[in-house]
């Protein structure tokens, strides 16, 4: 449910549903986006913003999560979302549009942040256990088994971002060649408004996704996440990237106790894939528009 790693192993029990549970104590010190910046002043500012916005609420959720115990692996995501009060309303018939076998790339817009990755994991895991999600590295260090479904994506300000990005792409391609599922947010950033009081806009989609699709021969399934982050986040985004980063824990709290109903589209047809075969950038622009236009 959060980006903090367990402090050590805990006994496994059974919650009555057949799902093993573990009563793990999480390290509160790692509950921060401040560690994504090396500069001590920037890190300090982010830590202070987090403390006065969403961190205390998230800490209370963690304590609740620890007391009730959590399933390990795939079941971790549903238990975490339940603790956060996030009910997923996507119907099973939409999830069944995800092919049961063969390489698949699932693409989605990115309106919220970490919560999008958690929802991705819960929904896709109901259909395909062989999925990997490309997500910011903070989300990969939670439950050890749940984190194994993630490929870390470095933040742009990471001094080693280029090397880590190359490794990430190689892992994703290898998984697709093995017939697995790779899910990602092609924009690479959370949607934000162009003005302080305008609507959040999904950023352009990276052409790397098109190259990955072409080289792997994977089927493509679009998914649209409704909603956007709070107005405070949109304003912060226009003021400073540090202020924006400091509000990411606040956005986790903002997402709590609200249902989410991502819309899963049908796999792209061969005709749709062929229409932009020689234009990766044009293909991604079309795929972005196609995904954002999905309706129930």
Which residues are covered by each model-predicted region?
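Non-catalytic C-terminal accessory region of glycerolipid acyltransferases
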Residues: 2, 9-12, 29, 165-296
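Membrane-anchoring hydrophobic helices of lipid-metabolizing enzymes
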Residues: 2-107, 117-119, 126-130
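Catalytic core of membrane glycerolipid acyltransferases/transacylases, capturing the structured
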Residues: 47, 56-60, 105-161
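Short, conserved catalytic or adaptor-binding loops enriched in Gly and charged residues
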Residues: 78-82, 142, 252-255
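Short, flexible loop segments at the rims of nucleotide/cofactor-binding pockets, characterized by
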Residues: 81-86, 110, 158-163, 198-199
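Short, charged beta->alpha transition segments
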Residues: 87-96, 135-139, 169-172
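Hydrophobic beta-strand scaffold residues
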Residues: 88, 131-133, 182, 220
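Residue-level detector of flexible, active-site-proximal loop/helix-junction positions
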Residues: 95, 138-140, 157, 227, ...
């Amino acid at each position: 449910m959060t980006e903090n790693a367990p402090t050590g192993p805990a006994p496994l029990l059974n919650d009555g549903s057949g799902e093993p549970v573990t009563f793990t104590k999480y390290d509160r010190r790692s509950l921060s986006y401040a560690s994504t910046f090396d500069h001590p002043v920037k890190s300090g500012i982010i830590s202070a913003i987090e403390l006065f916005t969403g961190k205390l609420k998230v800490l209370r959720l963690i304590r609740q999560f620890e007391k009730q115990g959590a399933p390990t692996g795939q079941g971790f995501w549903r238990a975490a979302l339940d603790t956060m009060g996030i009910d997923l309303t996507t119907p099973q018939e939409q999830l069944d549009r995800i092919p049961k076998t063969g390489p698949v790339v699932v693409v989605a817009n990115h309106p919220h942040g970490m919560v999008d990755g958690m929802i991705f994991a819960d929904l896709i895991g109901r259909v395909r256990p062989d999925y990997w999600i490309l997500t910011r590295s903070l989300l990969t260090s939670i439950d050890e088994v749940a984190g194994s479904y993630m490929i870390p994506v470095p933040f742009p300000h990471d001094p080693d971002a280029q090397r880590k990005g190359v490794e990430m792409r190689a892992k994703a391609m290898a998984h697709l060649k093995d017939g697995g599922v790779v899910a990602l947010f092609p924009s690479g950033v959370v949607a934000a408004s162009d003005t302080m009081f305008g609507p959040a806009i999904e950023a352009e989609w990276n052409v790397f996704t098109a190259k990955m699709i072409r080289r792997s021969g994977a089927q493509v399934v679009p998914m649209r996440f409704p909603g956007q982050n709070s107005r405070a986040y949109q304003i912060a985004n226009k003021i400073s990237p540090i202020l924006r980063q400091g509000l990411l824990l606040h956005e986790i709290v903002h997402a709590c106790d609200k249902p989410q109903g991502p819309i899963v589209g049908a796999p792209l047809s061969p005709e749709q894939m062929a229409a932009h075969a020689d234009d990766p950038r044009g293909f991604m622009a079309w795929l972005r528009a196609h995904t954002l236009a999905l309706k129930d």
